Amino acid sequence: MGCLLFLLLWALLQAWGSAEVPQRLFPLRCLQISSFANSSWTRTDGLAWLGELQTHSWSNDSDTVRSLKPWSQGTFSDQQWETLQHIFRVYRSSFTRDVKEFAKMLRLSYPLELQVSAGCEVHPGNASNNFFHVAFQGKDILSFQGTSWEPTQEAPLWVNLAIQVLNQDKWTRETVQWLLNGTCPQFVSGLLESGKSELKKQVKPKAWLSRGPSPGPGRLLLVCHVSGFYPKPVWVKWMRGEQEQQGTQPGDILPNADETWYLRATLDVVAGEAAGLSCRVKHSSLEGQDIVLYWGGSYTSMGLIALAVLACLLFLLIVGFTSRFKRQTSYQGVL
């Protein structure tokens, strides 16, 4: 009986432990794409994400940042939000002017493409970190570090001259510091509070198997599709029993139109060795009840297996106690 109790306790601990979901962080990432066809034609568009959710967009044809979620303003007042948008309008105008001046000064050839990635991440305890990176023609050239601009190791030589000019602009450097160190963490904290119900949502994946194009004579390409899950982190592997198949090739995690995600994982095998293979899916929404699909059509859930084991153990425990109680009653009758 002691062994049976131990097994029951161990199984319960395993079930509870597997349901734990690690704490997620939600960085705010703002992406700016600026195109300069020549000195007179330019276009700048922007997007922003909080974690995996797109929250804002900014079209070149508009002076207003578009909110894509009901909670995209966070806890900012209307006045704070308008002030922030005014700063962005001034920034966009200044950025366009400065790039044209640098192109002339450094004799850069049009067309020019620049990308800016900036934002911050708030950690428990109100600690935060931030970033501001600039790329030219698709390659990182500089970033804002602490109180000044610094070149990347791969930056062309002319970037050093541009940085000398940028670092002389004290007002701009102080504004960037204020936005990254103060405004951004405050804004993100408000977004996390206002959008917490959507940010913490869990959507269970759906999974199915199919056969891909034949990789060669006598071989099969097994495909495991996983779709409709949120949040993005997911674990998908082809298995033989409990042994992971090292040949598993996961694809990119792609977005669905409903803000969930899709992934497929393939395995190239000899046709005669496909029997006994399965695809296992782990995701936080499943709470430890992994999806397992067997090649050939059968389906099971590791959670259901665990529940079945617990039910059997509980049944045996009840039977054991009942039997022991009857024996004790019988002994008392004899005495």
UniProtKB/Swiss-Prot annotation:
Residue span, Ig-like domain: 185-292
One GO CC annotation: extracellular space
Tissue expression: Expressed on cortical thymocytes, on certain T-cell leukemias, and in various other tissues.
Alphabetical GO biological process terms: antigen processing and presentation, endogenous lipid antigen via MHC class Ib; antigen processing and presentation, exogenous lipid antigen via MHC class Ib; detection of bacterium; heterotypic cell-cell adhesion; immune response; innate immune response; positive regulation of innate immune response; positive regulation of T cell mediated cytotoxicity
Matching CDD domains: IgC1_CD1
Cytoplasmic face of the membrane: 323-335
Protein localization: Cell membrane; Basolateral cell membrane; Endosome membrane; Lysosome membrane
Classification via SUPFAM superfamilies: Immunoglobulin (SSF48726), MHC antigen-recognition domain (SSF54452)
GO molecular function annotations of the record: beta-2-microglobulin binding; cell adhesion molecule binding; endogenous lipid antigen binding; exogenous lipid antigen binding; lipid antigen binding; lipopeptide binding
Membrane-spanning parts: 302-322
Binding locations of a D-galactosylceramide: 98, 169-172
InterPro entries the UniProt entry points to: Ig-like_dom, Ig-like_dom_sf, Ig-like_fold, Ig_C1-set, MHC_class-I_related, MHC_I-like_Ag-recog, MHC_I-like_Ag-recog_sf, MHC_I/II-like_Ag-recog
Extracellular side: 20-301
Annotated S-S bridges: 120-184, 224-279
Main location: membrane
Membrane topology: Single-pass type I membrane protein
Quaternary structure and interacting proteins, as annotated: Heterodimer with B2M (beta-2-microglobulin). Interacts with MHC II.
Protein function: Antigen-presenting protein that binds self and non-self glycolipids and presents them to T-cell receptors on natural killer T-cells.
Note: During protein synthesis and maturation, CD1 family members bind endogenous lipids that are replaced by lipid or glycolipid antigens when the proteins are internalized and pass through endosomes, before trafficking back to the cell surface.
Protein name per UniProt: Antigen-presenting glycoprotein CD1d
